[in-house]
């Protein structure tokens, strides 16, 4: 691949987990009967970009409808109806809290769902938007601006669900493998950098083929089979 989503340098990251590396490893470990359900947020984008769906697997999300809190109850429904499939719920630290009380439903019905929560300490997509277009005015997106998380370890243990913490790339494979093989529900918290970016990303005013970080103009034109569309300065400045 000329422009791989999972860059070599991502594997060298020492602190926190790189989400692209994480979903690459998750993709490798899941069998072809797995059902993966992702919520709305940065974790959905990272999953769609770097998870390679195998034949027989199913990956669901509400996508453009974007309802935070969808994935967990959807995973519960999938688990009830698909006893022989591994059910993987992909959530964020914000979206899991929309229906976190349903951990009791998982316990009461003995559903072996793997609940993966990617924790970037806030609303990452909105924060990235605020950084790009609002001069880094982080309102209602970070702990400092009013968005905080509970102690997920204590929450999962209060419901009697086994808790796992993945805090760097080196721990991804070992913990995921153990959790996936378990026949019980598992809560897996994945710690990301608070400023973890979605890359590549389309910015205002650019045509869909001209993603950020931008290629040099000569390389971009070389890749194009049709005439290029100029970047709209008017649209960019309006936003």
Please provide the spans of the model-predicted regions.
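Generic beta-sheet signal
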Residues: 34-36, 85-87, 113, 184-190
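Thiamine diphosphate
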Residues: 45-124
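Glycine-rich beta-alpha junction loops
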Residues: 40-42, 119-122, 191-196
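Active-site diphosphate/adenylate-binding microenvironment
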Residues: 2-73, 78
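Conserved thiamine diphosphate
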Residues: 8-9, 131-175
């Amino acid at each position: 691949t000329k422009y791989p989503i999972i860059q070599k340098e991502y594997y060298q990251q020492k602190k926190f987990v790189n989400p692209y590396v994480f979903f690459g490893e998750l993709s490798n470990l899941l069998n072809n009967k797995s059902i993966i359900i992702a919520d709305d947020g940065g974790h959905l984008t990272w999953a769609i970009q770097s998870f390679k769906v195998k034949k027989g697997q199913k990956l669901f999300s509400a996508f453009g409808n974007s309802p935070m809190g969808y994935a967990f109850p959807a995973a519960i429904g999938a688990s009830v109806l698909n006893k022989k499939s591994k059910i993987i719920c992909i959530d964020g630290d914000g979206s899991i809290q929309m229906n976190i009380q349903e951990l009791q439903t998982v316990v009461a019905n003995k559903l072996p769902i793997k609940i993966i929560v990617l924790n970037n300490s806030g609303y990452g997509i909105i924060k990235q938007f605020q950084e790009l277009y609002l001069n880094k005015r982080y309102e209602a997106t970070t702990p400092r601006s009013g968005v905080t998380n509970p102690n997920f370890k204590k929450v999962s243990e209060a419901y009697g669900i086994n808790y796992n913490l993945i805090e760097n790339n080196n721990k991804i494979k070992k913990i995921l493998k153990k959790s996936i093989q378990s026949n019980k529900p598992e809560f897996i918290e994945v710690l990301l950098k608070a400023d973890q970016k979605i890359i590549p990303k389309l910015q205002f005013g650019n045509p869909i083929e001209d993603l950020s970080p931008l290629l040099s103009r000569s390389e971009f034109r070389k890749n194009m089979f049709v005439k290029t569309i100029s970047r709209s300065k008017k649209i960019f400045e309006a936003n």
